[in-house]
């Protein structure tokens, strides 16, 4: 909370590789400016795991355009998570945004049932559960994707549908979903920015 005001909670899901990042940035910026006009006196918070691509783009713009507070839910221990970043430039981009965050926290995914590993399908499941966490808590979810169905369970298309339907499948929902910060028992508004056409 900022000055006692409860923030509007934004979330992000999207592709790690954006076909036209400049176009996506312009489209997201336009949507955020519209949010600022629609809610001129409200503070904002952004939930973003800061994966490459859409996560970082939306987080950066939420900070720049809306003055949003950044919260970073991680799907696994941070040292392990960073191994998914492409190189030094990506590591530096992550570090720059991380320094601007209010909080970086590892989700209690292992507490959701059997301990998951960190490789293969178990790793993908961790990402899906992080996406579910964001979809479960965002009042407005920015989905920067091509509109296609998810290639595997828990991809961008699934996360967007979970938010729209107001229902995350039980196997992806963290057990503390209803008693942690950023949980609001209402419908999520989805802002779809087409990854290829804006």
What is the role of each PLM region?
Residues 1-198:
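Acidic/glycine-enriched connector segments
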């Amino acid at each position: 909370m900022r000055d006692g005001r409860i923030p509007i909670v934004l979330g992000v899901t999207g592709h790690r590789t954006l076909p036209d990042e400049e176009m996506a940035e312009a489209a997201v910026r336009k949507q955020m400016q519209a949010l600022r006009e629609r809610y001129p006196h409200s503070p904002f918070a952004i939930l973003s795991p800061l994966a490459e691509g859409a996560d970082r783009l939306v987080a950066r713009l939420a900070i720049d355009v809306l003055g949003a507070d950044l919260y970073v839910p991680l799907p696994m221990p941070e040292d392990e998570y960073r191994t998914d970043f492409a190189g030094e430039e990506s590591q530096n981009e992550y570090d720059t945004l991380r320094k601007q965050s209010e909080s970086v926290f590892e989700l209690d995914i292992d507490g959701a049932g059997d301990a998951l590993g960190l490789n293969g399908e178990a790793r993908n499941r961790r990402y899906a559960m992080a996406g579910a966490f964001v979809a479960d808590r965002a009042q407005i979810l920015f989905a920067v994707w091509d509109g296609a169905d998810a290639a595997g369970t828990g991809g961008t298309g699934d996360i967007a549908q979970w938010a729209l339907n107001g229902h995350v499948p039980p196997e992806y929902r963290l057990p503390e979903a209803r008693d942690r910060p950023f949980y609001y028992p209402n419908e999520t508004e989805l802002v779809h920015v087409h990854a290829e056409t804006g």
